[in-house]
Structure formats: structure tokens, C-alpha cells
């Protein structure tokens, strides 16, 4: 089973546990006015996941100095990174979150898709050299200038 398949199965199992494993049951929750409670429960579960990730980072802190997160544009990487960083702070760590949005090249240098749209998913859309310099500075515990 791939990691994606395992994640899908985990969420399907959790949906069964909380009694919301079909669209009909979700509609019933919504119509009965219990949607805020469900949202709060989902948020609490997600926060628990962030805490688990922070624990893994804490226990590997001597061997791992950089943690990276990947995903497509607008998938929640920055928000998740900030929440994981907060959980790391609870454990006494001092994380530095780097938002990759700050490393895009100037618009005129951004690659375009075949349809002429800006391709922010392309590696060429990022200033990789500058990002590398910043990561190296972080590893050397230097102050970042942007």
C-alpha cells in the first residue's frame, strides 16, 4: 500500500469511527446544525497530527536540521508549516519557517505553460540559487537577508 493509499484508508477508517463516512451522513450533520462540532473535531485531529510530526522532528533534532514540505500551489504547505513550527516550539525547539513564495523569480522570468499562463509549478519559477544560499546560511546559523 502506498503512503497515499494508507492516508486515504486512515481517513476512511476515521470517518467510520466518528460516524461520518458517507456524504449522506455528512449532509445529516450539516442539516442538524452539528457541522461546527464536526469542523472543530477535524481541526483537533489535524492539530494532533501536527503534534505527532513535531515529536518526530524533536526526536531526530540531532540528525536532521532541515525539514521540507512539498505539494502543489495552494495546498496548505505554509499554513501547515506554521502550525508544525508552533508545535515544535511547545517542545522547546526554535524552528525557522521559510515560505517558498518568497523565492519566486520576477514575473517576467516566470516560465509559461503551453497555454501561455504563468507556470508557478515549474522549477524555473523559483530562484533556486538564492534559496540554496539561504539554506546554507541557515545551516551555518547566519541571519537571513531577503
Per-region residue spans from a language model:
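Hydrophobic positions on the alpha1 helix immediately C-terminal to the Walker A/P-loop
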Residues: 79-84, 99
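Post-Walker A helix-loop "phosphate-sensing" segment adjacent to the P-loop in P-loop NTPases
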Residues: 86-96
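Conserved nucleotide-sensing/catalytic segment adjacent to the nucleotide-binding pocket
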Residues: 96-98, 105-146
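Phosphate-binding P-loop
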Residues: 57-64
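Hydrophobic anchor at the beta1->P-loop junction of P-loop NTPases
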Residues: 67-69
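P-loop (Walker A) phosphate-binding loop of NTP-binding proteins
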Residues: 72
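Conserved glycine(s) of the Walker
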Residues: 76
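Charged, amphipathic alpha-helical linker segments immediately N-terminal to NTP-binding catalytic cores
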Residues: 3-55
